[in-house]
Amino acid sequence: MSPGQDATLLERSIKIAFVVALYWVVSISMVFLNKYLLSEVSLDAPMFVTWFQCVVAVVTCFILGELRSYHPALEMFPRFAFDTHVAMKVLPLSLVFVGMIAFNNLALKFVGVAFYNVGRSLTTIFNVLLSFFMLQQRTSMPALLMCGVIVAGFFVGVNKEQEQADLTMAGIMYGVLASLCVALNAIYIKKVMPFVDNDMWKLTAYNNMNAIFLFLPVITFMGEIPDIAASEDVYSGNYWFLMTVAGLLGIAIGLVSMLQINVTSPLTHNISGTSKACAQTILALQLNDESRTATWWLGNVFVLGGSLGYVLVKRAEMKRDLEKVPSSADSKA
């Protein structure tokens, strides 16, 4: 290998390491900051916190769209001009999106960060079930076996978390509902993308704009308005700073996820996400000075290992299907 190739390889390795580290920092920071806002501040208004993050997302998308002509890196962000017709087309997805982020934050409020990944681990299972019932797509036996490993890890984790920590049934149910909504969200995104010119950032803007209006009756129904009006936190600049940072991290995670996929691959992105979840669990236990039994850790290993195994199985199946296409074309010729 020539010196020039060595230098190029080193530069690429440094770039990959930087992007992966950035993804970890943004993702873990977002989880811990949301946990703080939902559990540690005196204002108990999880739907209001989620609503404000949607406001930050829309404002950020609008600003980035207006700045797109000032730098080539910003050209990926479209100018956001609200169209009622498009918003109505996106509305079914927005309803699922509201459920997803609402249940996600409620799950984070009622469970510890260390258990958060286990509590949200059934997304893959719901993906398989919804793909079968809504899209008539069957799942192979190896993939189903990996799903079985995930389910086993979930129940082991729930059982041991109940023994060692203050885990409520509400926390478990919110985690399950969040997983269901994440799976539904993935299906509806595919249906809605043509209405936004297959532009993910335009979809983000419309989705969050719809969510701003959809969350208002939810906030009222949950009785959060009197709590907001009576809270001293809303008069604290530090509170609004942290709320804004949390909203910006929500946008940033989409950016760094795409960046990580671009400089590596979708498979590496999934492996990085699994590794990050493990590091996040260890960090949460260290920061809270907590310990868990070997069986609790076994549940986590099942969840993370099953999730990674599912990704590897699906990748192998996709590769095999792609290899069949040229061979079938050759046989017809």
Swiss-Prot record:
Which keywords annotate this record? Answer: Golgi apparatus, Membrane, Sugar transport, Transmembrane, Transmembrane helix, Transport
Q: Which reaction does it catalyse?
A: GMP(out) + GDP-beta-L-fucose(in) = GMP(in) + GDP-beta-L-fucose(out)
Q: Report the InterPro entries cross-referenced here.
A: Sugar_P_trans_dom (IPR004853), TPT_transporter (IPR050186)
Transmembrane ranges, per UniProt, are: 13-33, 45-65, 95-115, 139-159, 169-189, 211-231, 239-259, 293-313
Per the record, membrane topology reads: Multi-pass membrane protein
One Pfam family recorded for the sequence: TPT
- A cellular component term (GO) from this record? Golgi apparatus
Q: Which GO terms describe its molecular function?
A: antiporter activity; GDP-fucose transmembrane transporter activity
Q: Which cysteines are joined by disulfide bonds?
A: none
Per the record, the GO terms for biological process are: GDP-fucose import into Golgi lumen
Compartments it resides in: Golgi apparatus membrane
Domain of life (superkingdom): Eukaryota
Q: Per the annotation, which location comes first and is thus the protein's main one?
A: Golgi
Family from the record: Belongs to the TPT transporter family. SLC35C subfamily.
User: What's this protein's function?
Assistant: Antiporter specific for GDP-l-fucose and depending on the concomitant reverse transport of GMP. Involved in GDP-fucose import from the cytoplasm into the Golgi lumen.
- Listed PANTHER family: SOLUTE CARRIER FAMILY 35
Name of the protein in its database record: GDP-fucose transporter 1
Q: Which gene encodes it?
A: slc35c1
